[in-house]
């Protein structure tokens, strides 16, 4: 891709104080594992190979619309030690940014896995905000991975970027789609073991 996102695809870590994260719009989210450990799997021959913990994280991301109202999912990709995903909020009474969230396409990438819809796997979301949704997702992944006996923990914070227009949406979506192929150039890159398997289950 020709257009870079913020120069080196770096994402600000602090919430924007001037923005209500319950407003309608699209949000680019990045969450990292604790100490950048390869909990989610490994990349081999340009493909992401999910660990069992990665399968849990993949399934639960796709469950988000069952637990948070008026949410659609854009591009999503698990990497060995982090994930990238786009959340689209489109509540009928929500405020809008510079464009209408209903105009944006939705897309699912990566591993198409699913659970029985409607099962309550997340904590009560409370307000339909980015922080509550991602907080619920991260808590659910940790809870279910640990319950299954898999070592796992998150870095405390997550990174977000408010997507303000369609061009930015398309640029970021392409970055997510090609993230696996560009793994060794990624700012979160750390090497795996020589076998190509992840360090953790």
Question: Where would I find each of the regions flagged by the language model?
Answer:
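Short catalytic/metal-binding and nucleic-acid-binding patches
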Residues: 1-201
